[in-house]
Amino acid sequence: MRQGLLVLALVLVLVLVLAAGSQVQEWYPRESHALNWNKFSGFWYILATATDAQGFLPARDKRKLGASVVKVNKVGQLRVLLAFRRGQGCGRAQPRHPGTSGHLWASLSVKGVKAFHVLSTDYSYGLVYLRLGRATQNYKNLLLFHRQNVSSFQSLKEFMDACDILGLSKAAVILPKDASRTHTILP
């Protein structure tokens, strides 16, 4: 009788652990097969970010809104430009997307871009997961894109919930407005 209860308890613990792990996997970056890349294309403000990579953002006193331009070059090829204002101008990254699956692979200009996932969007905002790294190093980056330079409460809440799931809550930053030159990265 005791062995039966012990086995039952172990099975119950195993089922609970597997269920908890699968819930994270269901949300954790998934493919965006239903994403309309033409609607997602265009200019975006980067209103918030969370990262575990050092040096991804300027110093705290120099942080301003970032910007991004997403463009479909041709069928199956996506080009993404990210810019954050720095003391000497904008820091830019131009990774390219060779397939249609939602993954963004690095071009020669940016080494170490492993993935670009759109986790959630209604085409007025986008929650984007960017994975950077080389060899055994991996860095998680979560970006909140918005068409306007202000965000809704709901999209900020979704951003913070995603930060919790990815373990980036302490690194979450809401970027202050800067209307001076963010629009200058437009092609």
From Swiss-Prot:
Compartments, record wording: Secreted
Annotated signal peptide: 1-19
Coarse class of the protein's main subcellular location: secreted
A single GO BP: inflammatory response
PROSITE patterns: LIPOCALIN
Top-level division of the source organism's lineage: Eukaryota
This protein's GO CC annotations: extracellular region
Glycan attachment sites: 149
GO molecular function: small molecule binding
Residues that bear N6-acetyllysine: 170
UniProt family annotation: Belongs to the calycin superfamily. Lipocalin family.
Name recorded for this polypeptide: Epididymal-specific lipocalin-10
Organism: Homo sapiens (Human)
